[in-house]
């Protein structure tokens, strides 16, 4: 570490004549430091030299980590951002904001003191990527698995020393994560090929890891559960102190939450107007007494759409259904040139492994390495009953594919990989990510499917009301105005969800703070930019030029993106 800092100082002192050179030197030093201290992230982004290790988590390691972050912030603050080019200034803002967020988490959230997922997620992700990424050659895969397995017992022992309080909710999540890690570890031998001595050593490490994990699980449930309790999420003060670090300093919590509630009513009314004709085909005109009657009409209509036999999809044909849907969406987007044809990612469909722990029906994997020609795995959650029905109907599969593949997340990833900046690729703006996915679905409907029947539009708007409702409950839940049970009830009712759908959103808000609020702001911001862009261009407006402007400079914060797009 001392060598890295010596390099930083020498480079910066030697480049005083150029603020831009100083920033470039500092950012490169930070990236090297980041991958060294985050070896699982290095593996995730395709940096091969850290495959065999995990992040160091002892008290002294955390202190060194915090001190390094503080030094990077000091060095970065000494670079005059006004002397940077507009493009480099964006990277400066991204890096500075991310460093401040890391510093806040380490100083205020301090997850290693109460959240077992701090170490369990590191273990799971580190092994899962090595197990599933196809581009890792076998020698590196074996060496990486071997090194990481050896580290697990010590990591769990260190975690025991550092946890001083508990959150019952996170112990529950931790138990599920441990079960998933054990399942993953049991499958590792069939993923590896090496000499017998090495494989025997790995087998012994697997036995030791499973024993350590089961011991850790017992300790969580019997010992940690009796330590002082953390009142999650209230004790974390997410609704006020954390908000600017996760959302951005330009957004005010009160203003955001006020807009959320206003938007909820508007979207629900839109859904109702589309639902009523369908409802009246099988029902008498309802007698409206209160808002609940309006919601009941919508709920009945959504259930009616999902239960129609012609809309349902057999699990046995799910892969072909997804392929047909994606091909159809690609033809739609290309027929009007909505996105550049030569910037896209190859996508391979696969059933997710049983040990992949995700509440979502689909998930992208292996899209992080900055290689435009690499392939993305699109995991579909499998089900034991191969003759049964897939949980999503055909309309919902189209919506999901528009969001994640084309013209959604996969297209955004491809453009981000083409842009040269490593800082903005390493730390993409989460509000931009979420906003583009929602906009991608809206764009398909507005540009191509506007004359489709109301059922599609109802389900599209249901996706938006899910975002809005999740944003609302995060404001209430994080501030202690609503407990988890009441938040679940609210989101089920207001967003027309079943139990599993509501639980999936709650888990997101539990483990990935402000997921709903980020998506809501992203949805509002990108539509605001589109409206202003259309106004500026008038008759010269072209949707493909707008999309190109949004995508071509990487996944950057909206305050910077807006300047770039509207200056064109």
Feature-to-residue mapping (PLM):
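Sec-dependent signal peptide recognition
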Residues: 2-8
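Hydrophobic h-region of N-terminal signal peptides that target proteins for export
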Residues: 9-17
């Amino acid at each position: 570490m001392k060598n890295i800092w010596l390099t930083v100082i020498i480079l910066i002192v030697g480049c005083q004549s150029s603020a831009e050179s100083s920033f470039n030197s500092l950012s490169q030093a930070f990236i090297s430091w980041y991958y060294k201290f985050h070896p699982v992230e290095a593996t995730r982004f395709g940096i091969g030299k850290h495959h065999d290790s995990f992040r160091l988590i002892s008290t002294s390691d955390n202190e060194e980590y915090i001190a390094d972050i503080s030094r990077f912030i000091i060095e970065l603050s000494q670079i005059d951002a006004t002397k940077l080019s507009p493009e480099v200034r964006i990277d400066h803002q991204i890096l500075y904001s991310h460093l401040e967020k890391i510093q806040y988490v380490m100083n205020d959230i301090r997850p290693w003191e109460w959240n077992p997922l701090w170490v369990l997620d590191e273990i799971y992700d580190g092994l899962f990527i090595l197990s599933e990424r196809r581009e890792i050659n076998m020698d590196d895969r074996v060496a990486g698995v071997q090194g990481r397995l050896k580290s697990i017992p010590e990591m769990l022992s260190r975690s025991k020393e550092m946890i001083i309080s508990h959150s019952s909710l996170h112990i529950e999540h931790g138990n599920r994560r441990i079960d998933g890690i054990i399942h993953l570890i049991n499958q590792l031998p069939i993923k590896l090929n090496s000499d017998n001595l090495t494989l025997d050593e790995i087998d012994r490490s697997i036995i030791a890891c499973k024993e350590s994990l089961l011991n850790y699980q017992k300790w969580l449930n019997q010992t940690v559960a009796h330590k002082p309790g953390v009142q999650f999420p209230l004790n974390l003060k997410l609704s006020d102190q954390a908000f600017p670090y996760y959302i951005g300093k330009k957004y005010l919590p009160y203003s955001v939450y006020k807009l959320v509630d206003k938007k909820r009513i508007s979207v629900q009314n839109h859904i109702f107007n589309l639902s009523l004709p369908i409802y009246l085909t099988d029902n008498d005109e309802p007698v409206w007494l209160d808002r609940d009657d309006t919601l009941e009409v919508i709920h009945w209509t959504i259930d009616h759409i999902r239960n129609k036999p012609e809309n349902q999809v057999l699990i046995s044909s799910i892969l072909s259904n997804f392929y047909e849907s994606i091909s159809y969406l690609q033809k739609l987007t290309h027929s009007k040139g909505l996105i550049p044809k030569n910037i896209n990612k190859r996508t391979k469909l696969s059933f997710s492994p049983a040990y992949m722990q995700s509440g979502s029906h689909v998930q992208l994997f292996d899209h992080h390495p900055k290689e435009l020609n690499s392939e993305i795995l699109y995991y579909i959650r499998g089900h034991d009953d191969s003759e049964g029905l897939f949980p999503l109907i055909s309309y919902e599969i189209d919506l999901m594919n528009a969001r994640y593949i084309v013209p959604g997340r996969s297209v955004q990833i491809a453009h981000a990989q083409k842009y040269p900046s490593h800082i903005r690729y390493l730390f993409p703006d989460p509000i931009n990510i979420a906003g583009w996915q929602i906009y991608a679905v809206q764009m398909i409907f507005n540009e191509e499917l506007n004359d489709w029947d109301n059922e599609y539009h109802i389900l599209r708007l249901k996706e938006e009301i899910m975002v809005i409702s999740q944003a609302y409950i995060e404001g209430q839940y994080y501030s202690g105005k609503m407990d988890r049970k009441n938040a679940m009830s609210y989101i089920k009712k207001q967003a027309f969800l079943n139990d599993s759908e509501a639980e999936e959103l709650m888990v997101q808000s539990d483990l990935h703070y402000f997921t709903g609020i980020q998506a809501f702001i992203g949805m509002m911001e990108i539509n605001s930019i589109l409206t202003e862009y259309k106004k500026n261009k008038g008759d010269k407006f072209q949707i493909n030029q707008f999309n190109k402007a949004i995508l071509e400079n990487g996944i950057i914060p909206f305050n910077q993106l807006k300047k770039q797009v509207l200056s064109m």
